[in-house]
Amino acid sequence: MQATEANFDGLVGPTHNYAGLSFGNVASQNNDKSIANPKMAAKQGLRKMKQLADLGFKQGVLPPQERPSMRLLRELGFAGDEAGVIERVAKNAPELLAAASSASAMWTANAATVSPSADTHDGRVHFTPANLTSKLHRAIEHESTRRTLRAMFADPSRFVVHEALPGTPALGDEGAANHTRFCAEYGAKGVEFFVYGRSEYRRGPEPKRFPARQTFEASRAVAHRHGLADDATVYAQQTPDVIDAGVFHNDVIAVGNARTLFCHQLAFVDQKSVYDELRVKLAKLNGEFNVIEVPDAQVSVADAVSSYLFNSQLLLRGDGRQVLVVPQECRENSRVAAYLDELAASKAPIDDVLVFDLRESMKNGGGPACLRLRVVLNEAERAAVAPGVWIDDTLFTRLDDWIEKHYRDRLAPADLADPKLLNESRTALDELTQILGLGSLYDFQR
C-alpha cells in the first residue's frame, strides 16, 4: 500500500526560555540564564514547517503544552491561589519554577516512538509516548503528549496511542530521538532501529561524565509493545565516549531514513556489526542499505555537537533522492560546511542541503531533527488524522498571526515569576485549540 512520511513539528510555546535544565546537553548548559525570544523561536520553527510543506513534504504541527505546569507545582506541595503559588516558588525554589515553565515539549522527536502499520502485529500505527524520566522538566510531558496524540490520531481502528512506559531509570525512554526506520518503500514492512545508551541488567560500557538517558530495556519494551518482528528489529548501543562529549540523544550523531543511514564514524559500539545487521535484515525485505559515514578526521565529534550536523532531517523526495535539512550553524563551522559542499557534489543518495535559521531552539540544544516527530501513514491513515493540523497557506497565516498576537519577544529567567505569563499562555493555547480543531486539550479547559 502506498504510504508517505509525515513530519509533525512542535510549535514552540509562549514560555520558551533558557534555564540550563538539561545536564549533558552542551548548548542548554552554555546558554543558561540567557534572554530568550519566544516570538522569534515560534516563528523560526513555523517557517521551517511552511517551507517544507511548500516543497511537497507532508507537514503537520503539534501544539505546545500548558506552561507553567500548575499541576507539577501543586504536586510538589505549593498550595493556594495560582499567583501566590508562582510567587512562593519563584522566591523559595526558582529551579522548580524553571522546570515547570520549560517549553521543551517543542522537541517532538522526544514526544513518542512511532511504528507504522506495515511493521506492527495488528496493522495499526502504534505510538508510545516517551516517559523522559531523566529530567524533571521533561518527565511531566507524557500525559499531555498522550492526550494530544489521541486527539490527533483518534481512530482506534487505525491508531494505538499507548501509555508511557513505567517511570523508572531502568526503563528510561527518550522517544524517536533514539529510533529510526529503514525500508525499501514507506508502505512496505521495514527494519526498525533502536539506539540505547546503557543497559540496566546487562554488563557493558557506560559513559562516565554525562548520563545515558535511554536504556536497552526501554527500547526492547517499546518494540514488544508495538508488536515488531525480531527479524526486522535492530538494537545498537551509542558509543559512551560520544555521550560524554555531549551527544545526549542518538539524533545528535546519526540520522536515517528509508534506505540511508547518515552518521558519524564514532556513533555506535561495534559499528561495522551494526551496519551488517541492518544490511542483512533490510535485504530480506528487498531493501538496499546505504551508509554515509562521516570520518572523525573530517568532522570531529565536537564539531558535530556544536553544529548539529546530524540533528538534521533526512527527507525522501518523490524522485528517490534525499534532502538534508540542517541548521544555520552548519554553515558557520568551516569544516562542517566544507563537508556538506562535498556531500552535495558527490553521487551519494543525499544530493541537496537546505539550511534553516533555528537559532532560538539551537541555543537550548534542539535542531531540525529535535523539532519533528516522523509518522509514516498510508492514504487512509492520513485521511483519519485531525484535519486542522496540516500546514498549508491558510494555517500558516493563522498561526503566524496567533504568534504575533500572543507571544512576548523577550523572556528573561526573572520573568517566569510574573503570574501574568500563565494567563497569557492560557489565553493563547485556548485560541490555538480552536484554530487546530483539537477540542479541550488542556487542564485549564476542563
From Swiss-Prot:
Provide this UniProt record's keywords sorted from A to Z: Arginine metabolism, Hydrolase
EC no. given is: 3.5.3.23
Enzyme superclass (EC):
hydrolase
The residues responsible for catalysis, as annotated, are 174, 249, 370
Q: Which domain of life is it from?
A: Bacteria
The pathway to which it is assigned is: Amino-acid degradation; L-arginine degradation via AST pathway; L-glutamate and succinate from L-arginine: step 2/5
SUPFAM superfamilies documented for this protein: Pentein (SSF55909)
Molecular function terms in GO for this entry? N-succinylarginine dihydrolase activity
Show the catalytic activity.
Answer: N(2)-succinyl-L-arginine + 2 H2O + 2 H(+) = N(2)-succinyl-L-ornithine + 2 NH4(+) + CO2
Query: Which positions are annotated as binding substrate?
Result: 19-28, 110, 137-138, 213, 251, 364
Q: Which InterPro entries match?
A: AstB_sf, SuccinylArg_d-Hdrlase_AstB
UniProt-listed GO biological process terms: arginine catabolic process to glutamate; arginine catabolic process to succinate
Subunit structure comment from the entry: Homodimer.
Please report which protein family the annotation says this sequence is part of: Belongs to the succinylarginine dihydrolase family.
What job does the chain carry out? Catalyzes the hydrolysis of N(2)-succinylarginine into N(2)-succinylornithine, ammonia and CO(2).
HAMAP family in alphabetical order: AstB (MF_01172)
Give the protein name, as stated in the record. N-succinylarginine dihydrolase
Instruction: Name the species this protein comes from.
Output: Paraburkholderia phymatum (strain DSM 17167 / CIP 108236 / LMG 21445 / STM815)
